[in-house]
Amino acid sequence: MARIIALDGAQGEGGGQILRSALSLSMITGQPFEMSGIRAGRAKPGLLRQHLTAVRAATEICGAQVNGDELGSQQLRFTPGPIRGGEYRFAIGSAGSCMLVLQTVLPALWFADGSSRVEVHGGTHNQAAPSADFICRVWEPLLARMGINQRTTLIKHGFYPAGGGAAATVVEPAASLRGLTLISRGETRRITAEALLASVPHHVGEREVATLEAHFPRAEKNVVALEGGCGPGNALSLMIQSEQLTELFAAFGVKGTSAEAVANQVAHEARRYLASPAAVGEHLADQLILPLALAGEGAFTVARASAHLLTNIAVVERFLPVTFNLEEAREMVQVMVSKKDSGS
């Protein structure tokens, strides 16, 4: 029997990413794991609905044996079986992030025995999670360059606290994964400011994109009023398309926060990205660690190595025979991954 990998859920930034990465890697490598202190670094520790859905989705996709899969649990034991392609549907039962559930199981389905379709119901545009727009416009185009055939479709927008959204991904098994190198982003080709409004007055979106335009005069503006009772909710994004990749920065309207404050939050993050010579933003960097590790090669630059990034690297290195090297240079960090020397 494969050895059980013991993981401390409180390590590093102590969030749900440790669990999601462990589930993905356990399914792919066949190595079971035990985790204690799940989300110990959070105000509400233990498994929330979103994390529990990710655990149960992983369990169904690989026929795993699992202990500790209940709300609030800070302990989990997961013993995977073979990954099975097919049609899957999961409901979070809250406004928890559909995208984080998808990002847990999709890497495993790159190695499945056939094509798959995964549909998840919950939130699609959440604080502290990649939005559906980020997945479709930023992450998946980079995965395609690595040889991964995956396409996500937004079925219905879902915002906190109501949820009610849905997204589905169709994925084919990958013959092999290629490395990816993102050292420089190249020239900026296009900037787009977009406000999504669901049961929110139109002037809110107009003020948001106007504020972004003041920061980025080249930006194209788009205000979208969503139909179908998916609100209330408001998401603002700034998409920056460069020669080598697309980045997207987002913030969400909150009661008591002005449209201008929401826009300034996005502008601050985007300006910080553009002021750095690094190719990749801080959040995208987190999303690249697992696919690059599975490819066994690749490199990117990021303005700084966040606690989230370092924690994710530490988990990946427990499951895969790869090594990450980080080198600081010229106001940025270069992150490189390579396969471990078989003699080491």
Curated annotation (Swiss-Prot):
GO BP annotation list: RNA processing
Name of a matching Pfam family: RTC
Origin: domain of life: Bacteria
Keywords assigned: ATP-binding, Cytoplasm, Ligase, Nucleotide-binding
Gene Ontology molecular functions: ATP binding; RNA-3'-phosphate cyclase activity
Gene3D superfamilies documented for this protein: RNA 3'-terminal phosphate cyclase domain, RNA 3'-terminal phosphate cyclase, insert domain
Binding residues annotated for ATP, in chain numbering: 103, 283-287
Described purpose of this protein according to its UniProt entry: Catalyzes the conversion of 3'-phosphate to a 2',3'-cyclic phosphodiester at the end of RNA. The mechanism of action of the enzyme occurs in 3 steps: (A) adenylation of the enzyme by ATP; (B) transfer of adenylate to an RNA-N3'P to produce RNA-N3'PP5'A; (C) and attack of the adjacent 2'-hydroxyl on the 3'-phosphorus in the diester linkage to produce the cyclic end product. The biological role of this enzyme is unknown but it is likely to function in some aspects of cellular RNA processing.
Name of the protein: RNA 3'-terminal phosphate cyclase
Lineage: Bacteria, Pseudomonadati, Pseudomonadota, Gammaproteobacteria, Enterobacterales
